[in-house]
Structure formats: structure tokens, C-alpha cells
């Protein structure tokens, strides 16, 4: 649990950001005369306010607290302490706040700007611009961040395929248009890169609206994403909402609701499909645990808040599609200590349609995207949705890779030559399948020098079927690594064989006497030398 005093965030960066929030804080609601109060206690981000007369502000109502020489502080009511006092949580740094400071109830919850005015902009939890663009107009339309999910009768089930162009996802864990998908993984396995690639792919493929919620992540990553989107030309149809890790827990806790309010506006008022991306939902849970501790609630399992399940459900149930417009959510979920039984992870997993599990072992082998083909799953992998051929290939791919994993201990102890002929053949195909399911990403092109590839589902199925059939048994494994379609791999294999032939011809021409043999062969595709027989049937 973070030290409450550490949430004040009185650094220069916070002060500069909040100086730009002045106009937005004054617009969160229409202040009422009878809503005047005064601060009676300040404990880090927790502010107790007394109201001498009139009704108390409602739960989740926004309060504004002017501060001498600084921007007004925005707080949200979370508890009624008595007939004349409430406990509120500040969404900004409380440095400079004193007992006795005047407080004004706004008459409603936090309201954030929506509509075309926010497209291409970076916003804070209160809707204040955080980029170098112009201030939002005073008459821009605003919506409250707190609202219920659409009635069940109006919701539309998610049963249409949402193609991403990423082979391993489309084949083994297909996403649903209007559904929820989560990328589960520990630190450093590629969750954020995968989310950024999905943003790039979705904007190019579907030309819809994208809303990105950066929840408790690094400021550096948020800045890089803003620059990358500007450079790729997709920022114009995207809204970025950030609550970075240096901000108080209340701000990080409410960022998903701000992003949802914007997405719901485009869904309900404009009838537009929306791609909602959240990175990282675990930080939402973590911020909720901090808030729970600050408000004096007893912790539950592993130190989480006792309201963990209800908070996650309230967020996830608002992500819904209606007739004529869909909200498709893709969420990155950090798995602490790679423990998939963590209460936060299991609470989030209960609400998603597709689970994409990123594996540290796959990342260590260089298999990017490091998606575990066996652990990942989707409710859409059904013959009635994706077709019999798709399901048959997906099941066989999983079976072959899983059987290969069962044999890895035997191979490590005795060597692959001790396996039977059928098992050796299966191991070779499993390794080729693993490499074929890797893929270069457009967002990493600047670092790898390799152009990104987007692959149609039909090409992915055809490629996997050919490998399972044995059409590629005599190919180098490296020819299937980091390619798009099987045709790309075929060209890579042909080029490698041609290079081998030229090398052998040159070696033969340079030898004066009888040819000598070498204990190693060179893999031209990977540029590495390895002992003969170590290729497992390349």
C-alpha cells in the first residue's frame, strides 16, 4: 500500500499539469449556493469537509476547493461522516491545502468533454487537455463519468469476428466485435506493444473511433504513444485519456470512467463503432486498493479492497454494445509475479470473452508476439461463428504444440534422436508452427528494420494446415520465423537454398584438393552456426 503522503504529487510536472486544469475544474458542474462548506481535515489525498447548512452533497458528487496561488483542487465525495460532514478524495495534489479552506459542491458528478472536440487530443481524468493543443471551447458538450450500463433489452450480444491481422490471435483466440478481450502477462512480455499494434491495425482496418485509457502507466510510455500516433496519422480519430503513475490514486481510479464516458457518447449519440483500449486494468484495481486503504476500509485477500469484485464488475458491465453501434474493449492486464491465481487477475478474467495469455517462456525464446497458443482461449472459437475448418485447424495446432511441450523434458535429457519417428515428426511440425505464428509488427518497424505484416485469417489457416500436413517438413525453421503468409516463408526458404547453393559452389571452386568437411553448417536465414543434427529435421 502506498504511503498516503506520497500521493500529494507536489512535483513541478504535476503543478504544470494542474495549472492547465483550472477551466475544467470550474466546469465539472453548476455550483449551488447552498453547497458551501469548509475543509476540517486533510490526510494526504483524503479531505474531510463540513457543511454548516443545507443538504450534504451526494456520493460521487464533485467538490471544488480553491487554493491560494494554485489551481482549484477537484475532489469526489466517498462517504457521509455525519449529518454535516463528508469525506472526499482529491483527484489532484493537495499541496497547499489548509483547514478552513472554502469548498463548493458542484451539484453533480465529474463531467468531461465529449464529441469531435476531443478527437486527436490527450486529456486528464477531469477532461483537461494534456497536450500542446489549444484549450477546449467553453461550450463543448460534457457528460458525467458515472452512469449505468444500458438496459439488458437494449444490449446486443457479441458474435461477429473482429479480425486483427495478428495470426496467433485470429487463429487461436479470436476477438469479438462488441466484446471484451484481455491481454494477460507479467512485466516485460509485450502487453503494451501488442495493444499499440492493435490500435494501429484497428484504425487502418475499421476506420472507427479509438479511445485509449492509460491507467497508472509510465509517463514516458504515454508520451511515446502520443508521438507514434501523430507520426502514423491515426491520432485524428483517437482520444487519449491518461492518469499516469505519478498521479494520486483517485485520478488513476477514475480514468477508465472518463474514457468510458467518451466512448459511450460516440456509441449512443453518433452510432459509431468504438475501440476502447485500456492499459493497464490491473493499475485500476491497484488504485482502488489504495483508495480503500485511504478511506479506512479493512483489506481483503492479498491486501486488495473488499469491494474488488463489485468495482471490476461495475467497470466491465458498462462496456456494452447496442443496436447499430459496438464498443469493443481490449484490455492489458499486468499479472503480478506471473501469478494467474491473483484475485485481481481472476476477477478481471471472469468478464472477458477472449483471453490472450502472454508467456515469459515464449518471450525468452524470441517468439514474438509472446502469446501462449495453449493457454489463450476465446468463446468465439466455435464452428457456428468461425466455421468448421477454422476450429479444426486451431484444435490440431494446440494439440501438436501441447504434445511437443510434454516431450521437451525427454528431449532435454535424452535428445531428440531417442524419440520415435512419429514423435520426431510431430516435434518438427510443432517448432515450425511456433515460428510461423510469430509476426513482425508495424509499431516495432523503427527498431527491427522489418516491415510489419497484417495477415488475413484465411492465409493463417492455410499456412497452419500446410505445416500440419507436412508440406514444410524439409524447410528450415528459420524460414518460417517472423514472416506474414506461407508464401513469404516459401520465398525466404527459396532464397536461403539459393544462397546455400552459391556458397557450396564457391567453396568447391576454392578447394585445391579433395573437399573437406566441416562439423558445422551455417543457417543463412538466422546468421548463426549450429551443429549438424541440431535442427530437428530442418
UniProtKB/Swiss-Prot annotation:
Q: Where is the composition biased (Low complexity)?
A: 506-529
GO MF term set: ATP binding; ATP hydrolysis activity; proton-transporting ATP synthase activity, rotational mechanism
Report which reactions are catalysed by this protein: ATP + H2O + 4 H(+)(in) = ADP + phosphate + 5 H(+)(out)
For this UniProt entry, which segments traverse the membrane? none
Q: Which InterPro entries match?
A: AAA+_ATPase, ATP-synt_VA_C, ATP_synth_F1_bsu, ATPase_a/bsu_AS, ATPase_alpha/beta_chains, ATPase_F1/V1/A1_a/bsu_N, ATPase_F1/V1/A1_a/bsu_N_sf, ATPase_F1/V1/A1_a/bsu_nucl-bd
A Pfam family hit: ATP-synt_ab
**Gene Ontology CC annotations of this record:** plasma membrane; proton-transporting ATP synthase complex
Q: Per the record, which residues fall in region Disordered?
A: 1-30, 494-538
**Which residue intervals are annotated with compositional bias (Basic and acidic residues) in the record?**
494-505
Q: Which residues form a coiled coil?
A: none
Q: How does it assemble?
A: F-type ATPases have 2 components, CF(1) - the catalytic core - and CF(0) - the membrane proton channel. CF(1) has five subunits: alpha(3), beta(3), gamma(1), delta(1), epsilon(1). CF(0) has three main subunits: a(1), b(2) and c(9-12). The alpha and beta chains form an alternating ring which encloses part of the gamma chain. CF(1) is attached to CF(0) by a central stalk formed by the gamma and epsilon chains, while a peripheral stalk is formed by the delta and b chains.
Q: What is this protein for, i.e. what is its function?
A: Produces ATP from ADP in the presence of a proton gradient across the membrane. The catalytic sites are hosted primarily by the beta subunits.
Describe the family membership recorded for this protein in Swiss-Prot or TrEMBL. Belongs to the ATPase alpha/beta chains family.
**What name appears for this protein in its UniProt entry?**
ATP synthase subunit beta 2
